[in-house]
Amino acid sequence: MKRLLIFCFAALLCSAGASAQEPNYALADQFSAKKVGNMVFSTAIRPNWFKNSDKFWYEWKTSEGTEYYIVDPVAKTQTKAFDMERLAMEVSAIVKDPFDAKHLPLRKLELKDDSKFTFEVQSTEMVEKKDKQKKDDDKGDKPKGKPQKEKKIYRFEYILATGKLVDVTENEEEKDYPMWACISPDGSKAVYSKGFDIYWMTIDDVKKLMEDEKDSTVVDHRLTFDGTKDFYWGGSNYRGADTKDTTKRTANYVLWSPDSKRFAVTKYDMTKVKDLWVINSVAQPRPTLQTYKYQMPGEPGPVDHLFLFDMADGSCKEINIAAYKDQDTDVLRRTMKNADRYDDWRKSVWMGDNDGFYMIRRSRDLKRTDLLRVNVAEDSAHIVVHETLNTYVETRSPRFVNGGKDLIWWSERNGWAQLYLYGADGTLKRQITDGAFHVENVLAVDEAAKVIYFQAMGVDKNENPYNGHVYRIGFDGTGIKQLDDPGFNSNSISFSDDAKFFVSNFSRVDSTPQSALYDGTGRKTPLQEADLSLLFAAGYKFPTPFKVKAADGVTDLYGYMYKPFDFDSTKTYPIIDYVYPGPQVEGNSEAWSRGFTRTDRLAQIGFIVITVGNRGGHPNRSKWYHNFGYGNLRDYGLEDQKYAIQQLAARYKFIDIDRVGIHGHSGGGFMSTAAILEYPDFFKAAVSCAGNHDNSIYNRWWSEQHHGILEEITASGDTTFKYSIDKNQDIAGNLKGHLMLVTGDIDDNVSPSNTIRVVNALIRANKRFEMLVLPGQRHGFGDMNEYFFWRMADWYSEWLLGTSHRDQVDIRELNND
């Protein structure tokens, strides 16, 4: 009998040991953000278009170093801008520091006059820090100390036609216009703020301040006199009471008329918008309080007042734009051209002409949106286009064509995002695009050919509906044609100013990123393919795409599965669902990215990690799909996520349906906590980061838009707004699994109060859980992301694999990174 008991006890020990799977921290450690950064280089081209032609240049880095290319689309050529070996030798001879072709850091590389490059190179030579020393000496209130030193910066010009390198270090350096100056299109004057009012000065005085910021001869011409800290001129909405130095010149948001005679500006009344706070406990020398304006759902909002200034006499008048209580307005800005980037200052010009401009007006519940025209000779605005929906109206900036006589308007009025042609007077002329697909935006317009170029998803029903493609179509709605490659997602697109050519960066999560040049008819010239050779050499493998059904059994959902790179199909693995509920985007990406810490890298610990969409998630499908969660913002996506996991477990034997985890950040933090509380017998572990668990205290814009707010008009005619929503803390008593809550303590996006309220409810429900507060970190966790990763790895390893490194005080992987 004794012998039998010993045998049984030994068998139990063996069984317990077999049930635990050792987490593979070493494999995950190989793919830290820092290490991946040394294996993956350029993944997309950012074309820098020439000012006066369709040429462009770009930078491209691989494991062989960095090269710079000039592309001539007309001549169909791609040439290297520099002979890097020769350039490195010439720079070394001047700077007196050794460089080679693979190690030549060019700083501030810019094209000037389409004929030469300018750039800087930092040397190891220490020189006196002239500007700083001069300022300190000018103060005169401190004894002169040792001259401050800095590394010398050499400045160069490289002449394209001759390949000649010119050292211009000793030449007087061109100074940039100050950031506070909103300069008129004709370059004669600048508008800015001091304190809470608006001022202007001549451009000559601006230039004086560029030479000496204490020049006493400059004149500040004051335009307004009634600004206060909560009712101020020309700032951004919600800036509120953060201006402490009322003598300092600061930027304001004004938009000029094309002829520089007038400008429009909004004055924001923030007196009823309440403050919110965070305390930075690790600030030195003592903790600091940050106060900022933060409107929560149902609370009073800012009131926008639109003014038009006439620079001939400095007069202003208010434009009557009132239509809805707590409405939101935006004066539209002229679309920037590539050539504008070469100007000495960024031109802030309104969308319209010298006689008037256009703006958007939205009701607070976002069910009504107007495109307005404001004529400078009048005191009120005219409705051009009026949109209504029972959920909420979204818009895109219109494109004016035919000399401003017509406009291209984006609308979801028929359940899909489509393009419409309107007359400038508001007459609907025709629907341009027509079909069960989503038009994301207008990319370019060729007015001479009367062709619109746009990006759309879901046109080809045989493709993943999230794949974005470039199309062309005539103003009359005919001749629609796809221009880029099928089967990929064009996620970054740049057109030449004349709309004759475009560069597309395209990929999928399971393919290497590529870049190509196309002309307006779709003729393709390949440019680059990302160099992932070092990543693959380290063992990297692409994730696997999949398609499942939503819980309704009808709607298709799309996702990706991330496996350990040492995956063994004979084993079983826990599954972790990385989630973001939407509604502005879903957790699953459609383009390859090096930022895969919470998916690919997490899988290396020993998990199957998935991302999958859910009804109510992504806006790039139908309006029905996007608005599915309207009015049910806490729970709308949970059932689909659970059902997707169940389908995958039935499809793949290596998934252990009894070991399910869930993880998310921000909206995903909110969703992952809701999931483990709503389905406590299904989800066994969750890590929820920076979650907006209580959307009644999250920002009004996101919460009211995606959940809805009730607008009521009383018998006396007053308008009130009521907001009610289910919160995670309401169901804290349901917790059975293992929940880890994480927040930065100075998160001024999603207040830490969201997490604290869930913590409070869990404590009062007598629940065990984990809480991690990251000191001095905002919404994205900053330089503590790597620390967070290993704490997350510990949590899932402990509760899904059965063992972890939580018993080790030192995180060795962090010490070795």
PLM feature segments, named:
Residues 14-17:
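N-terminal signal peptide c-region/cleavage motif recognized by signal peptidases
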Residues 6-7, 619:
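General helical structural elements
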Residues 7-10, 20-492, 498-501, 507-513, ...:
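Beta-propeller folds
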Residues 1-4:
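Positively charged n-region of N-terminal signal peptides that target proteins for export
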Residues 47, 275, 345-346, 354, ...:
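Serine-hydrolase catalytic core recognition
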